[in-house]
Design a protein with these regions (language model features):
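A long, amphipathic alpha-helix that forms part
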Residues: 175-197, 201, 211, 217-264, ...
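Short acidic, low-complexity intrinsically disordered linear motifs used
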Residues: 548-569
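Polar, surface-exposed loop/tail segments
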Residues: 277, 401-428, 483-485, 491, ...
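Beta-strand elements within well-structured catalytic alpha/beta cores of enzymes
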Residues: 3-15, 19-20, 34, 58, ...
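Secreted, luminal/periplasmic, and some membrane-associated catalytic domains
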Residues: 72-102, 109, 117-122, 129, ...
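Low-complexity, glycine/alanine/valine/leucine- and proline-rich hydrophobic stretches
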Residues: 436-493, 498-501
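Active-site-proximal alpha/beta segments of enzymes that process anionic O-linked groups
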Residues: 3, 16-198, 206-213, 308, ...
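Short conserved micro-motifs at the rims of enzyme active sites and ligand-binding pockets
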Residues: 136-137, 374-379, 442-447, 480-485, ...
């Protein structure tokens, strides 16, 4: 019987293009030693590389078309209102539940998209997308529930989210808070690993992602937000945060039995700079795909919108006349609830005359189809024609580069069937856009934030890329080997099950990567694919009988998504 263990460390948002030089210089010695002693490669995320879809694909072993989670939010059934996604919406069993059923002891700490905490054969502390209600003690973020008291004693005051977001002059405060959060997660994980039995243990650190979103402009002289004096003063904060994580990993490795533990380090995606926004709903409005209600107030707001009365322009005025020139990244989101009635917004849309709209974080487009959307107008028989018309028009969008040369803004538009497969693929948006240059970010969910089609970005200074990292090390793993073909994020679950001697469900999209394993391990451990019929997870079925989140939790989750820059009104 296979008695080995698996430790998975998730480093949110990390890519090799960020950390390679630091590892070469031995500034991240723990990560470097894991690479030297094992296998590594880039890890291909889902597309779009959105956190909820990526982590869920990791822990289900399936593409989003088989688990049903595509974005930070989904449309509430029977309306155009968006609600945050959460784990009770996942329609496939997780790696954690599969291992639990097989009798393996499971530990899960701070993994995104695990709230509400699920019952496992072990313990779970939920992570990113847990509603920030202001008091974790009133939130169902642990299993078993009494684990809350235990981790509060270990950590002092356990938190999931940072207290601060970047403004001019607060970097030291921001980074200090990151240190606190990193240390808390490491200490809680170590406590659980020492005090509780586990065969599979997983910890995710999110600060590796947060610092990139907030402070990428410190690294990039070409970034529109680059400030040479600020960059020089804080040139080393990125490395210091990553070194704090690296030191924490070293602590974790000191308390495991390395002879019987396989270690996996992975990220859900990478990040890179964002210089410009493409305001997709503004384009859809200009081209007549979105219609505005013919009531006086909506028509007036539309006229004001065309003349530049928009949240984006008001924000720029605030910056221009700010005495202290404080760049508060989330100020607009905070104020928007107060002033939204003065700006053109989704309440002004005439859905009965709208053919297409964008609600996704990276510019996904839905056709307003009759019989599917509440006020759909496009006949199902005409859907393909409308999509093809949109594809042609979208790929014709132009911009000018820094030299004034005209360039394409959109490289490719894909239909959902080109990205997803499975019983829930039909629930995805209809069209997905890919930009021609990585520095562009497509805004879909921000309804009418600007009357400009393409403009300089503000807020988060980096956004997601598809290139994550994968490192594996341990008794079952080949040494000093680079995998020539980067695995996809949904392939990892199958390989983790194989490390633990568990048959792999046949409905997984991932297969065992034989190049990862030693010949001895392969010869002694048969690869077994179990013929199973995909079924909705028990958690999802139970969630249909009751609300997955309360109204207060939905509001809290949505507010946190805004603060993190993942959702805009």
């Amino acid at each position: 019987m296979n008695k080995s263990k698996v430790l998975v460390i998730g480093l949110d948002g990390v890519s090799f293009r960020l950390i390679n030089e630091w590892m070469r210089n031995n500034q991240l010695p723990t990560l470097r030693s894991l690479m030297e002693d094992g296998c590594w490669s880039e890890l291909e995320s889902v597309y779009p590389p959105l956190t909820p879809a990526a982590w869920t694909s990791f822990y289900t072993g399936k593409n989003p078309g088989k688990h049903g989670l595509f974005d930070y939010q989904l449309r509430r059934q029977g309306s155009y209102q968006m609600i945050p996604t959460h784990s009770a919406m996942v329609k496939s069993d997780s790696l954690f539940k599969i291992l639990s059923r097989k009798g393996k002891k499971v530990g899960v700490v701070n993994v995104p998209m695990t709230y509400p905490a699920d019952s496992v054969n072990g313990f779970m502390i939920t992570g990113l997308f847990t509603p920030d209600t202001g008091d974790l003690n009133k939130t169902n973020f642990t299993y078993p529930q009494q684990l809350k008291e235990e981790i509060m004693k270990v950590s002092g005051q356990y938190r999931i989210y940072p207290r601060f977001f970047y403004t001019k002059g607060n970097i030291e405060e921001l980074v200090s808070d990151y240190y606190t959060l990193i240390d808390q997660k490491i200490n809680v994980a170590m406590h659980c690993m020492r005090s509780k039995p586990w065969d599979f243990m997983m910890l995710v650190i999110n600060e590796t992602d947060h610092i990139q979103h907030q402070l990428w402009h410190l690294l990039d002289k070409n970034h529109p937000d680059y400030d040479a004096r600020e960059a020089q003063r804080y040139a080393d904060v990125f490395l210091k945060v990553y070194q704090r994580v690296d030191a924490g990993l070293s602590q974790l490795l000191e308390i495991i039995d390395k002879k019987n533990t396989n270690i996996v380090v992975m990220s859900d995606h990478g990040l890179g700079p964002v210089y410009k926004w493409i305001n997709l709903n503004t384009w859809l409005l200009r081209k007549g795909y979105i219609a505005i209600k013919q009531r006086p107030l909506s028509l007036l707001k539309h006229i004001m919108f065309r003349f530049g009365f928009t949240p984006a322009n008001i924000y720029r005025l605030m910056l221009r006349f700010s005495r202290n020139k404080v760049v508060e990244k989330n100020k607009l989101s905070e104020k928007r609830g107060f002033v939204s009635r003065f700006f053109l917004n989704e309440n002004d849309i005439d859905w009965s005359a709208t053919k297409a709209y964008s609600i996704g974080h990276m510019g996904q487009i839905n056709i307003n189809m009759k019989g599917r959307e509440p006020q759909g107008v496009v006949e199902p028989s005409a859907q393909d024609a409308v999509m093809n018309e949109l594809i042609t028009a979208l790929t014709g969008i132009k911009d000018r580069d820094s030299s004034g040369r005209q360039v394409d803004a959109i490289k490719q538009v894909l239909k959902k069937g080109e990205l997803f497969w499975g019983p829930y693929a039909k629930e995805a948006a209809d069209l997905y856009l890919k930009v021609s240059r990585e520095e562009y970010h497509i805004l879909g969910g921000a309804t009418f934030i600007s009357n400009r089609l393409i403009e300089r970005s503000y807020g988060n200074t980096a956004t997601h890329r598809t290139d994550g990292i994968f490192i594996a090390c341990g008794p079952a793993i080949n040494k000093s080997q680079h995998l020539s073909k980067p695995p996809k994020i949904y392939e990892l679950a199958a390989n983790i099950l194989y490390m633990l001697g568990i048959p792999i469900p046949g409905d997984f999209d991932g297969k065992v990567i034989e190049a990862l394993f030693t010949p001895e391990f392969l010869s002694q451990n048969e690869i077994i694919y179990q013929d199973v019929r995909q079924e909705q997870s028990a958690t999802y079925k139970a969630a249909q009988a009751k609300a997955g989140l309360t109204d207060d939790e939905i509001r809290a989750a949505k507010e946190m998504l805004k603060k993190l820059g993942y959702v805009r009104d």
